[in-house]
């Protein structure tokens, strides 16, 4: 446990280090933060914080920088304060859904970019899991003689678009007939479905197309639960370039792999969660990930992540995510 004065000094060191990217000395602390104590007292308190492993000295500077443990203590205090705050929730996602004609993928793509522009960090948005949602309708639209667009409408009102190649050109009337058949059979995806398809179709090519349609639809819905939309990838590269060029490649490999999806899906809490450095992975000591949930409605929800260097503006990011519903 640290004293109130030590906490104030630690907060000042963290915030100055994040703002300026340089180790912080006692003289700088007094000048920037109007601390009403002597430089000797500040140095003594900093020595105590260093002994507790909250700050550390670099070889090239007489100042101190926050350790991972120091960042963790600082973040825990922020999270504790945030949990007691009442904020007006933003429903930007619902606006984006309407603007994108209820196409979830398009809305999430815009959402990831907007979050990145606001936070000035790289963002990831995980596609919601449709297990709690029910397919209401399937519409087929002929884009050209050999390409059909399948529009899947869920009970929540959300829409997914899937491109489907066709070996033969179907008329619009035939596609409407197939759409109605598939929609009517949505609740009957069982062992009798294949018999129904055989009875319904008028050619082997129709049978092949309908089976392909059903398999594609099921695979798309399953795969979408693992889809991740990234915004502002270059922001992470720029931030890491300033601190540690050698760390960029393993970090990019991590956030572009299934491991990041697994990490985000494992965080099921609706509360804001912060993982710092090695808490994420032993090879990722230079980044932090702040996660939260977003909602389209009470049942359809997914994960948001903001990724940046360990010297992140945590307060700004936490306040931003705390306002998202």
Curated annotation (Swiss-Prot):
Q: Which SUPFAM superfamilies match?
A: GAF domain-like, Winged helix' DNA-binding domain
A Pfam family of this chain: HrcA
Q: What superkingdom does the record give?
A: Bacteria
Q: Which InterPro entries match?
A: GAF-like_dom_sf, HrcA, HrcA_C, WH-like_DNA-bd_sf, WH_DNA-bd_sf, WHTH_transcript_rep_HrcA_IDD
What does the record note about the induction of this protein? By heat shock.
- GO annotation (BP), single: negative regulation of DNA-templated transcription
Q: Name one GO molecular function term.
A: DNA binding
Q: Does the keyword Repressor apply?
A: yes
Which keywords accompany this UniProt record?
Repressor, Stress response, Transcription, Transcription regulation
So what family is this one in? Belongs to the HrcA family.
- Extract the PANTHER family matched here: HEAT-INDUCIBLE TRANSCRIPTION REPRESSOR HRCA
Q: What does this protein do?
A: Negative regulator of class I heat shock genes (grpE-dnaK-dnaJ and groELS operons). Prevents heat-shock induction of these operons.
HAMAP family attached here?
HrcA (MF_00081)
The name this protein carries in UniProt is Heat-inducible transcription repressor HrcA
């Amino acid at each position: 446990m640290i004293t109130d004065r030590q906490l104030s000094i630690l907060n000042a060191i963290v915030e100055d280090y994040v703002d300026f990217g340089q180790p912080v000395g006692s003289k700088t602390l007094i000048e920037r933060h109007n601390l009403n104590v002597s430089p000797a007292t500040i140095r003594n308190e900093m020595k105590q914080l260093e002994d507790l492993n909250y700050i550390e000295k670099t070889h090239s500077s007489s100042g101190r920088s926050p350790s991972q443990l120091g960042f963790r203590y600082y973040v825990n205090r922020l999270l504790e304060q945030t949990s007691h705050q009442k904020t007006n929730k933003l429903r930007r996602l619902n606006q984006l859904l309407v603007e994108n004609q209820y196409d979830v993928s398009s809305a999430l793509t815009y959402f990831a970019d907007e979050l990145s522009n606001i936070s000035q960090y790289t963002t990831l948005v995980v596609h919601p899991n449709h297990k709690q949602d029910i397919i209401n309708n399937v519409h087929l639209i002929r884009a050209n003689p050999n390409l059909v667009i399948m529009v899947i409408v869920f009970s929540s009102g959300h829409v997914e678009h899937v491109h489907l190649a066709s070996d033969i050109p179907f008329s619009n009337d035939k596609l409407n007939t197939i759409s109605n058949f598939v929609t009517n059979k949505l609740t009957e995806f069982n062992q009798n479905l294949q018999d129904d398809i055989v009875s319904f179709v008028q050619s082997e090519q129709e049978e092949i197309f309908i089976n392909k349609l059903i398999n594609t639809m099921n695979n798309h819905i399953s795969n979408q639960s693992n889809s991740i939309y990234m915004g502002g990838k270059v922001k992470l590269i720029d931030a890491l370039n300033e601190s540690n060029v050698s760390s960029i490649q393993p970090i990019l490999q991590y956030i572009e792999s299934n491991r990041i999806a697994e990490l985000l899906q494992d965080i099921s809490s609706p509360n804001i969660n912060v993982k710092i450095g090695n808490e994420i992975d032993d090879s990722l000591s230079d980044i932090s990930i702040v996660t939260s949930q977003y909602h389209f409605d009470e049942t359809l929800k997914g994960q948001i992540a903001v990724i940046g260097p360990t010297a992140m503006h945590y307060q700004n990011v936490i306040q931003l995510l705390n306002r998202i519903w």
